[in-house]
């Protein structure tokens, strides 16, 4: 693990990304379509149906997606490079990308793409055609993300200069273009990458991510993932799979969004429409809370071992968001000390509440006091402590609750869960 960490940090230091994105850039909420489609690729009608779903989440619950990324098969596929001028692409998208782009733009969403890093062919003409195709996505469609994957094939060393030049042209039109390096052995072209795939590992539950111990649900292996090297946010953890094994997905998403809080967070993929109707408010709530606190989540510290495994506190000197987890069969009590230990500077009073697994207003405490919380077996927790009253949100004292709807200009809906 230490060898892997040192290797990653060396790469990050030697090849700082030449984009407008830094370690302190705000996160982007992303969905990518892997498992909704696989290497066969998606279609225009399928994509528009998916975008309609996210439009509904936005209108109903205020959930805002930043990036909708096409996964494998839109243009490139496994071991093949394609073209938007091919008959294969035209059969799937008879109107090109115009309708999809306009639908996404109407909802404040930008598009992204899975593909391979090469595809330049062996002639100047083929190289220019490949370059123009990808640059045109940025020029014409305000492209947000390229995920280049070794599954499609490597980047030939003699083509690295072409690649660097192409990405430079792309960023003239999309300065904040995110380039994900998925297991590519890049050399000179590494300077173009925004993130790397943490541990080279994907997160499809029970396929790429699985339990290594007896547990009551299938996501314990995912909950047990550690912390990225030095809490570097320009890392990609492949997000949270919403397709199979849907129990306790929210615990994993809380850790993805608030514990690691990477550049792409919250990040989901698969088929979120398979969630039950009662779960959509929770999905939106996690996205909405992350957006509300996004400016605070760029800075984090790892907490002492007394807080449990991989506990992290994020925020500034007035407000902290703390993520805890329990990977055992017994409830674990944790004392959260409201002082510099969690990153709070001295103040008079601190307001505390839970956001997950339930919402609960815990009360107002003096600086330096401790708040004892109980983390349930094989669950995560999101705890909030703040001396900044301007960040206070709605809630109900004396009972656990969940926010169903909190959309500007619409009635607020709260579900009361029972008195504490």
Predicted regions and their residues:
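Generic "edge-of-domain/loop-turn" microfeature
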Residues: 36-38, 75, 120, 329, ...
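C-terminal beta-strand-rich structural cap/linker in extracellular carbohydrate-active enzymes
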Residues: 362-413, 417-419
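Aromatic- and carboxylate-enriched substrate-binding clefts and catalytic-loop regions
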Residues: 64-252
């Amino acid at each position: 693990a230490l060898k892997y960490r040192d290797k990653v940090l060396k790469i990050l230091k030697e090849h700082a990304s030449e984009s407008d994105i830094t370690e302190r850039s705000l996160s982007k909420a992303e969905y990518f379509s892997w498992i909704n489609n696989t290497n066969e690729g998606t279609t225009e009608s399928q994509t528009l149906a998916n975008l309609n779903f996210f439009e509904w989440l936005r209108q109903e619950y205020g959930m805002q997606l930043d990036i909708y990324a096409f996964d494998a098969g839109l243009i490139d596929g496994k071991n093949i490079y394609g073209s938007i001028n091919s008959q294969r692409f035209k059969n799937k998208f008879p109107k090109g990308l115009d309708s999809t782009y306009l639908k996404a733009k109407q909802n404040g969403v930008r598009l992204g793409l899975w593909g391979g890093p090469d595809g330049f062919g062996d002639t100047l003409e083929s190289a220019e055609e490949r370059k123009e195709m990808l640059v045109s996505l940025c020029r014409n469609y305000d492209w947000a993300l390229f995920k280049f994957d070794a599954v499609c094939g490597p980047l030939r060393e003699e083509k690295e200069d072409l690649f660097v030049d192409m990405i430079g042209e792309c960023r003239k039109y999309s300065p904040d273009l995110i380039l994900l390096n998925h297991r590519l052995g890049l050399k000179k072209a590494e300077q173009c990458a925004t993130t790397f795939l943490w541990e080279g590992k994907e997160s499809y539950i029970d396929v790429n991510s699985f339990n290594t111990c007896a547990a009551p649900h299938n996501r314990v292996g995912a909950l047990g993932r550690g912390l990225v090297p030095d809490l570097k946010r320009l890392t990609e953890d492949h997000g949270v799979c919403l397709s199979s094994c849907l129990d306790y997905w929210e615990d994993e998403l809380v850790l993805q969004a608030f514990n690691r809080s990477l550049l792409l967070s919250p990040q989901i993929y698969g088929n979120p429409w398979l969630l039950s109707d009662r779960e959509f408010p929770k999905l939106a709530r996690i996205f909405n809370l992350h957006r509300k606190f996004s400016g605070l989540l760029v800075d984090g510290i790892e907490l002492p071992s007394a807080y449990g495994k991989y506990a992290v506190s994020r925020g500034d000197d007035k407000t902290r968001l703390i993520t805890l987890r329990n990977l055992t069969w017994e409830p674990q009590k944790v004392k959260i000390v409201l002082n510099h230990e969690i990153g709070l500077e001295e103040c008079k009073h601190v307001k505390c509440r839970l956001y997950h697994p339930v919402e609960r207003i815990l009360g107002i405490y003096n600086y330096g006091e401790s708040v004892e919380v109980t983390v349930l077996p094989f669950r995560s927790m999101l705890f909030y402590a703040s001396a900044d009253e301007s960040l206070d949100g709605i809630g109900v004292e004396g009972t656990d609750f969940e926010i169903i709807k909190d959309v500007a200009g619409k009635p607020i809906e709260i579900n009361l869960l029972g008195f504490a």
